[in-house]
């Protein structure tokens, strides 16, 4: 019998309890279910009908680095760089415009209009260019009467019209923000856009950005493909770790077709150390977060490229099982994060969030392995393998750094 993983069983039971309306219920312990059985266990999932997001989306978003200082040349050059740096071949496919791409006023027919100075060729021409590179284009709007910058109109009351416009341009992704919302509940403002996108005639990934205000992870699965669980990330250690913790508590609600979104990556923007960025990327990958690069990839340094192009870490994020890893142990800022992968493997992060070098240990009981299991431990950052590891895995780790492993049980 394949090795039993309590993590897989536990997370599946959480989903089942949610569906039958027993969110506060006691998790029933399931014995003797192999991980293969767990992977195929028939649990109903309420997912958006567009079939997108079977793994977390990967790509780039303009906001963290450029803010409103964005134009079509930057976007074209970013698409070029996505291909030339090898990121596209690793799965980074979305080139996403954030706020400020449109004129403040709609045209005489009520349609959104690209900013004439920044996007003189229009969004359709830009989408055509991005598509010619084998990539996909995303745009931004807001479930209010204006966007957060107040420089372009929101889509509240124009959902069907705007969705048809986006589809006619060849848009593949919509980030939908939450500003200028007139005090109307997100549960009233977001479903109309989800429905409009489904009726637009084009598959468009729907990224809901309501900042976790009304616990979208509970109700958004039938509406969108991802949902922000927190406010905006900032390019510093305290913001990144706080968001990681806030997002973690909703781990059981994520899965293929619908993902928790702790916001875009800050790797390469300069506000954290290399090891802090390594931790940032590792935790986002394990948490099955959308991997949307937020730096200027046209000018990124070698270290940034090395961090965001680690194929082994990306593979954890894109694993087909689609179970979000989570924090399973924390003692004095020494943490263990773990989650199950396909083929009975387990991903583990040993994270030192303390202010000094320390040893971090994950015992098999922490991460859901049976005590007698022997594994091969693949270090995803060192690209090395320890064979025949049993009982626990341990490492001495610098302050704010981490180690990330994939454990493969010996048969």
From Swiss-Prot:
Sites where the protein binds substrate: 210-214
Family matches, as Gene3D superfamilies: Aldolase class I, Golgi alpha-mannosidase II
Signal peptide per UniProt: 1-24
One Pfam family linked to the record: Melibiase_C
Propeptide part(s) removed at maturation, as residue ranges: 25-47
UniProt keyword annotations, A-Z: Disulfide bond, Glycoprotein, Glycosidase, Hydrolase, Signal
An example Gene Ontology biological process: carbohydrate metabolic process
InterPro entries found in the cross-reference section: Aldolase_TIM, Glyco_hydro_27, Glyco_hydro_27/36_CS, Glyco_hydro_b, Glycoside_hydrolase_SF, Melibiase_C
PANTHER family: ALPHA-GALACTOSIDASE, ALPHA-GALACTOSIDASE/ALPHA-N-ACETYLGALACTOSAMINIDASE
Family recorded in the similarity comment: Belongs to the glycosyl hydrolase 27 family.
Official protein name in the record: Alpha-galactosidase
Taxonomic placement: Eukaryota, Viridiplantae, Streptophyta, Embryophyta, Tracheophyta
